[in-house]
């Protein structure tokens, strides 16, 4: 490709409405342009990257034995009513009627459509297992689209759905998809983690997210320093302290704390170690518990994990924090003065709290705290559970190393759905015993457009994007200096250009009448991994300047060796 025949569309300035670096660089590098809120046109450079990501995904899905199909973006509302998600999904589901007043939706996902297809096409266990995938446009009417294509309304997604007659069969496909996803992101040279995750609104059993590590990520992910353990912070287990509870050294005593309504204020005013404080959070209880509220206790410097807490039998789902009015009506004190001593409602304490001694907590009297609280002596040890978020330095749940926490961008998610959709849509096959059997499902998604943005978040510098070779818009940029004045420079540039193209290398020959500084800046901005500079002075010594975008160092390569050098260094 020649720049004279290409739409480069680079920008010198960063658009004011671009928040994260990937959005800024995708606009400046001429990859995308905004059409409306959450809607983007992909320009040639962006589309080249998008297609590379798409092709890697397709190749690995094919290698894993998945079968490609294409399903409509527009879906009949009847299917969503039948599955029960018509009322569950909310305003993100764009609903409309056609000229015949028939209701439809723009598909945010395709569980209903694929299950409808299978219930009409597959009739016997002998035809299973099967795994179908598509790379298709999705639409979710996000209330606040942001971060460019990271959270847009229209996006390209690879979604796959597998069908089985047993959990064992599902597990085999699930493991194959896990391996395929790992291969996909490894081929793109991304630093990622596969983490245990919550199944969320889609439902089901086992679930893993594939997270690209990036400071701008919206998710906190946890992983071990010495093993492959990794999990979303919502699911990471906080292991009980190895050391047992220390002996009590203090007597229980009541302290006036009129100006200490938070842990931070208590610690500041009384110069307490925050590790010796406990905060008490009240949430709604289930009807079966016989109480209106449940108390959840975590150490002062720890955070309650709401997903873990919601799994406690007495805690109502969804987890709902009590209002100050409800707290006062039940306890007789405000939220800043709560604690376990003489508390008349069910109490659940975190594992770390259960191992504490001589700690401080509210006295259930406004403006007062107990200091020197000890379990069993001052209050019976209640139910103990893991209800907090892990913190850096915690012991890894697998016993190997300690935990680190980093931000991640979710680019893939795999689920074991079970029979949620097949039951709702009555998708059955004749089993080996001749009886109808409800199918078991898995679903597996990759946000193809989001992968592009995530790759930029992880691969950039002050000059622009640094693409991994596998997904770069071009492998090589050829920058001939003054080629319109030097026949020799032009001849060498054209010869190398044709040789590389003949070898299947994607080359961008910058044949514009531009200053060298502009040419260099544009190639660095769009992130071409390999650049060669051809000039008369170097040709006098039969050399060409080579520069790797990531490494940054310049090398002088003999003119007659440059093609072989590039072929040896390009990762395809």
From Swiss-Prot:
GO annotation terms (biological process): prolyl-tRNA aminoacylation
Assigned EC number: 6.1.1.15
Subcellular location field: Cytoplasm
Signal sequence residues: none
GO CC list: cytosol
CDD domains referenced in this protein's UniProt entry, alphabetically: ProRS-INS, ProRS_anticodon_short, ProRS_core_prok
Superkingdom to which the source organism belongs: Bacteria
Keyword Transit peptide among UniProt keywords: no
Alphabetic keyword roster: Aminoacyl-tRNA synthetase, ATP-binding, Cytoplasm, Ligase, Nucleotide-binding, Protein biosynthesis
Pfam family, one: tRNA-synt_2b
Main location: cytoplasm
InterPro entries from the UniProt entry: aa-tRNA-synt_IIb, aa-tRNA-synth_II, aa-tRNA-synth_II/BPL/LPL, Anticodon-bd, Anticodon-bd_dom_sf, Pro-tRNA-ligase_IIa, Pro-tRNA-synth_IIa_bac-type, Pro-tRNA-Synthase_IIa_type1
Enzymatic reactions: tRNA(Pro) + L-proline + ATP = L-prolyl-tRNA(Pro) + AMP + diphosphate
Top-level EC class as recorded in UniProt: ligase
GO MF annotations in UniProt: aminoacyl-tRNA deacylase activity; ATP binding; proline-tRNA ligase activity
NCBIfam families hit by this protein: PRK09194.1, proS_fam_II
Task of the protein: Catalyzes the attachment of proline to tRNA(Pro) in a two-step reaction: proline is first activated by ATP to form Pro-AMP and then transferred to the acceptor end of tRNA(Pro). As ProRS can inadvertently accommodate and process non-cognate amino acids such as alanine and cysteine, to avoid such errors it has two additional distinct editing activities against alanine. One activity is designated as 'pretransfer' editing and involves the tRNA(Pro)-independent hydrolysis of activated Ala-AMP.
Family: Belongs to the class-II aminoacyl-tRNA synthetase family. ProS type 1 subfamily.
Domain notes: Consists of three domains: the N-terminal catalytic domain, the editing domain and the C-terminal anticodon-binding domain.
Subunit: Homodimer.
Name the record gives this protein: Proline--tRNA ligase
Organism of origin: Pectobacterium carotovorum subsp. carotovorum (strain PC1)
